[in-house]
Amino acid sequence: MDLVFLHYNEALRLDPKHRGAHEYLGEAYLQVGNVAKAKDELAALDKICFFPCSEYTDLKAAISQYEARASAK
């Protein structure tokens, strides 16, 4: 998983507004249980997308699903 974070962070270093990298990085954070970092990526997408974009919508849904599963335990 470390390589995933390394590569997505490098993609964002090269292009800080790359919506796909923010979405996938947020989803990767969810896979390791770091909801706060996933929400940071969602906030970044909120600033980048002038109108709701699919990357924002998809990450928001993934976070909601993650939180619903966590609260159901």
Task: Outline where the language-model segments fall.
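Canonical tetratricopeptide repeat
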Residues: 24, 58-62
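Register position in tetratricopeptide repeats
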Residues: 31, 48, 62-69
